[in-house]
Amino acid sequence: MSHSVEYIIQHIPPVDTSLAGAAQAHLDNLTKPRGSLGRLEELALRLYCIQGGDTPLAADPARIYTIAGDHGVAAEGVSPFPQEVTRQMVLNFLSNGAGINVLCNTVGCEQFVVDAGSCGGAYPEHPRLIQRKIHPGTASIAQGPAMTAEQCRQALQLGIDLAGMAREAGCRTVGTGEMGISNTTPSTALYCAYLGLDPAGITGPGAGITPDLVKHKTDIIRRALAVNAGAVQSQNAVDILAALGGYEIAALTGLILGAAYHRMAVLVDGFISTAAWTAAWKICPAVSDYSFFSHASAEAGHKTALRSMGIEPLHDLGLRLGEGTGAALTLFLLRSAAAIFNDMATFSSAGVATQSSC
């Protein structure tokens, strides 16, 4: 049985950082110059702490959830794509035709598709589809709150339930992914509300709009922040999420909170996933202990948002697709870090002299 949103938030354990010394000592005793494997060593150390010092380290089993939702703000003309593309892409995911499918198949990672709030009716049943539609699309953030408080709570609970399902399946790692036409607009609004950023500095082309439409999109975000000023000024993280977010964004927030509660590593994807993570971090800062930021998105504003939170992502390949693609690529790095910790020989076991013994 899944725990409630309130219970999860109150019981997320910080990692035991006192274990870091033992992890570092082991890494320093492997047959290499100290620190020569760079950030892979940092990943291994963090995995060791997340897993409570249990060895061997494990990044697998891993699962990526690609969560779909539609947005009322699409009616404001902030995307070049019609809203029905969200539904079409859900079907594409289920047919293994999308970028996330190819990458998950390549790296050997399980992927589930979740309908949190796409427009239209139910989808045909599919073994990789979880249908938990809260409502067919949010209200427009340019006109008022995207969700009611209860709808936001349901979306958070959905994400928490997804984390619980992954843990019951034995997963050690979950990755975040999403699909929703116009969802860069609410994500940008969330960054502005949570981090005090200016829309003009972080609003980008999303799926490919013209400079004139970027200006229009910026104006829409400013309007959304003004219309929802009460929630923004309250600095209540959940109220802000309800006012400016989306069903898939709030579900990802719940997924991140739930994964941290279950002591799983979280691979955070790109621009939209990081907005969801920012909400989770504002709700419970301990989620940062479990989170690995896969990449710096090419979407304008992602690097600015990451920098404002002191976060250095693991790679920058110019990705801006979403879906969980960056998380899938980064799983290999997490696996590699675990393998280095588990399988490399120590100086003594390999009979290799250390620098101090030469």
Swiss-Prot record:
Catalytic activity: 5,6-dimethylbenzimidazole + nicotinate beta-D-ribonucleotide = alpha-ribazole 5'-phosphate + nicotinate + H(+)
Pathway membership: Nucleoside biosynthesis; alpha-ribazole biosynthesis; alpha-ribazole from 5,6-dimethylbenzimidazole: step 1/2
SUPFAM superfamilies: Nicotinate mononucleotide:5,6-dimethylbenzimidazole phosphoribosyltransferase (CobT)
A Pfam family hit: DBI_PRT
The protein's role, per its UniProt record: Catalyzes the synthesis of alpha-ribazole-5'-phosphate from nicotinate mononucleotide (NAMN) and 5,6-dimethylbenzimidazole (DMB).
Protein family per UniProt: Belongs to the CobT family.
Name of the encoding gene: cobT
Uppermost EC category: transferase
Catalytic residues, chain numbering: E323
Record-linked HAMAP family: CobT
Enzyme Commission number(s) from the entry: 2.4.2.21
NCBIfam families per UniProt: cobT_DBIPRT, PRK00105.1
Alphabetized UniProt keyword annotations: Cobalamin biosynthesis, Glycosyltransferase, Transferase
UniProt protein name: Nicotinate-nucleotide--dimethylbenzimidazole phosphoribosyltransferase
Gene Ontology biological process terms, A to Z: cobalamin biosynthetic process
Keyword Nucleotide-binding: no
Species, as recorded: Oleidesulfovibrio alaskensis (strain ATCC BAA-1058 / DSM 17464 / G20) (Desulfovibrio alaskensis)
Signal in keyword set: no
